[in-house]
UniProtKB/Swiss-Prot annotation:
<feature type="binding site">
    <location>
        <position position="268"/>
    </location>
    <ligand>
        <name>Mn(2+)</name>
    </ligand>
</feature>
<comment type="pathway">
    <text>Carbohydrate biosynthesis; gluconeogenesis.</text>
</comment>
<feature type="binding site">
    <location>
        <position position="206"/>
    </location>
    <ligand>
        <name>substrate</name>
    </ligand>
</feature>
<keyword id="KW-0479">Metal-binding</keyword>
<feature type="binding site">
    <location>
        <position position="454"/>
    </location>
    <ligand>
        <name>ATP</name>
    </ligand>
</feature>
<dbReference type="GO" id="GO:0005524">
    <property type="term" value="F:ATP binding"/>
</dbReference>
<feature type="binding site">
    <location>
        <begin position="448"/>
        <end position="449"/>
    </location>
    <ligand>
        <name>ATP</name>
    </ligand>
</feature>
<dbReference type="InterPro" id="IPR001272">
    <property type="entry name" value="PEP_carboxykinase_ATP"/>
</dbReference>
<feature type="binding site">
    <location>
        <position position="64"/>
    </location>
    <ligand>
        <name>substrate</name>
    </ligand>
</feature>
<comment type="function">
    <text>Involved in the gluconeogenesis. Catalyzes the conversion of oxaloacetate (OAA) to phosphoenolpyruvate (PEP) through direct phosphoryl transfer between the nucleoside triphosphate and OAA.</text>
</comment>
<feature type="binding site">
    <location>
        <position position="231"/>
    </location>
    <ligand>
        <name>ATP</name>
    </ligand>
</feature>
<comment type="subunit">
    <text>Monomer.</text>
</comment>
<keyword id="KW-0210">Decarboxylase</keyword>
<dbReference type="GO" id="GO:0005829">
    <property type="term" value="C:cytosol"/>
</dbReference>
<keyword id="KW-0067">ATP-binding</keyword>
<feature type="binding site">
    <location>
        <position position="212"/>
    </location>
    <ligand>
        <name>substrate</name>
    </ligand>
</feature>
<feature type="binding site">
    <location>
        <position position="296"/>
    </location>
    <ligand>
        <name>ATP</name>
    </ligand>
</feature>
Length: 539
């Protein structure tokens, strides 16, 4: 099928002067044959694995290149974007001038011109009223496969008159030799022009640049329309009650949002508008390091024909060693969302959220297993995006390493973080949603809070049992905590009781509180941020 809607004028606007052959929206069988073609070499060629999935390598680019991300600073973005050279908060939105943009676009256009091109037209966003119609152009079959997996696949009828709102030109094979003179970070680039509606990719083969690039675009467009744009997972219960799960890596977001009694809306990127919560994507992009059928059966079973593995170690017999992280700890698999059985069908959207859960894995042992949050506290902890991991020192002593990521996804924010907190709070208020902080980390006993206890806590939140529980106030952080919950050992609900003395907890709490206070200072460059300071910990 060839789209008649791709006009010569559009190709010119992309900077592409012609092509040898156009492969438009190929099916999975064709992509499978294309990407394992023995005539291919290097990073273009995939390897067939025993599961039926194809595995590809992306070279040194096993993750995003945050220092190589640029956005054209023009009349549209100058006063709206959260720039890396403005304000107190560090981010990846490095400004790019128009002249350099034109140069980069010519580089990518030259690379793609005269080639055999794959074009994938897809939707970003399950809600028709706000979805983005996106066109991906690449000369690499598996990159076409990746975006076919990850985004929402239009029907044949929808493809007939497809007019893109945004275009992604993936020129992974080209680089920018003039980067030094232009004041850029390296020869590689991931550049956005929000006025033209184009993303350029050069030098990096990492598939996630296309996925997260579109998330950054949605993060710019939707909040300006009053629609929440969120880095979270979402599911819905039998009573159509929707829950959102925010959390950084290692907090249990995927594990806790995967529930046999609840249908999955999506695992990573969502919007929330007047109709409810909706998935941006049509697929999943899961980590595979140390993957096992026992620990994560849904993901393991999703790795089959049409799934695409990235940077895994494939043995000579075609089996995959998921425990081998020699290429990267960020090994991934993309697959269509219908590879998961218990999902919302036919469209990945549901009603308004009634429960918003912020997950943290506190290695300091200070935060409670669960706390109910006021609307102001919800915004504060959303902006903080806190978790902590245990890391070894050179002497072998285990010490907590804190991580703060605004809105649980600072790398993908296009506007000031307070804009996302404001829109989320308005959506929560209109829906009567309640927010909770859930700590999946450690307490004073030195042990991690058990998955059994955490699941029981999550169930108490989803069933509203926690709302009727007796409560107390935890000092320093001023959190409302339950003193009893059915099925949970009451001794762990107040973290102070897990220490030999309350003074020991207090010393650690004061230390962690100061880290929160120091981090939150970067949001006080706006009145909205200043207004939320009192909702955080106080020393």
């Amino acid at each position: 099928m060839v789209s008649e809607s791709i006009t010569p004028q559009q190709w010119i606007s992309y900077g592409i002067t012609g092509y040898r052959e156009l492969v438009y929206n190929p099916g999975y069988d064709q992509l499978f044959a294309e990407e394992i073609d023995p005539a291919l070499s290097g990073f273009e060629r995939g390897t067939l694995t025993q599961s039926g999935a194809v595995a590809v390598d992306t070279g040194i680019f096993t993750g995003r290149s945050p220092f190589d991300k640029y956005v054209v600073r023009d009349d549209k973005t100058r006063d709206t974007l959260w720039w890396s050279d403005q304000g107190k908060g560090a981010n990846d939105n490095h400004p790019l001038d128009q002249q350099t943009w034109v140069h980069l676009k010519r580089r990518v256009g030259k690379q793609l011109s005269g080639k055999r091109l794959f074009v994938i037209d897809a939707f970003c966003g399950a809600n028709e009223d706000s979805r983005l119609r996106v066109r991906f152009v690449t000369e690499v079959a598996w990159q076409a496969h990746f975006v076919k997996n990850m985004f929402i696949r239009p029907s044949d009828e929808e493809l007939r008159d497809f007019e893109p709102d945004f275009v992604v030109l993936n020129g992974a094979k080209c680089t920018n030799p003039d980067w030094r003179e232009q004041g850029l970070h390296s020869e590689n680039f991931v550049a956005f022009n929000l006025t033209e509606g184009i993303q350029l990719i050069g030098g990096t083969w990492y598939g996630g640049e296309m996925k997260k690039g579109l998330f950054s675009v949605m993060n710019y467009l939707l909040p300006l329309k009053g629609i929440a744009s969120m880095h979270c997972s979402a599911n819905v219960g039998t009573d159509d009650d929707v829950a959102l799960f925010f959390g950084l890596s290692g907090t249990g977001k995927t594990t806790l949002s995967t529930d046999p009694r609840r249908r999955l809306i999506g695992d990573d990127e969502h919007g929330w508008d007047d109709d409810g919560v909706f998935n941006f994507e049509g697929g999943c992009y899961a980590k595979t390091i140390r993957l096992s059928p026992e620990a994560e059966p849904e993901i393991y079973q999703a790795i089959r024909r049409n799934a695409l593995l990235e940077n895994v170690v494939v043995r000579a017999d075609g089996s995959v060693d998921y425990d081998d992280g020699s290429k990267t700890e960020n090994a991934r698999v993309s697959y269509p969302i219908d590879h998961i059985d218990n999902i919302v069908k036919p469209v990945s959207r549901a009603g308004h959220a009634t429960r918003v859960i912020f997950l943290t894995a506190d290695a300091f042992g200070v935060l409670p297993p669960v706390a109910s949050l006021s609307m102001e506290q919800a915004q504060y902890h959303f902006l903080s995006g806190f978790t902590a991991k245990l890391g070894g020192t050179e002497r072998g002593v285990v010490a907590p390493v804190p991580t703060f990521s605004a809105c649980f996804g600072a790398a993908f924010l296009s506007l000031h973080p307070t804009a996302y907190a404001d829109v989320l709070a308005k959506r929560m208020h209109a829906a009567g949603a309640r927010a909770y902080l859930v700590n999946t980390g450690w307490n004073g006993s030195g042990k991690r809070i058990s998955l059994k206890d955490t699941r029981t806590i999550i169930n108490a939140i989803l069933r509203s049992d926690i709302d009727d529980a007796p409560t107390a106030t935890l000092p320093v952080f001023n959190l409302t905590i339950p003193t009893a919950l059915p099925g949970v050992n009451g001794a762990i609900l107040d973290p102070r009781t897990t220490y030999a003395s309350v003074d020991e907890w207090r010393a650690k709490a004061d230390d962690l509180a100061q880290r929160f206070i120091d981090n939150f200072s970067k949001f006080t460059d706006t009145p909205a941020g200043v207004a939320l300071v009192s909702a955080g910990p106080q020393r």
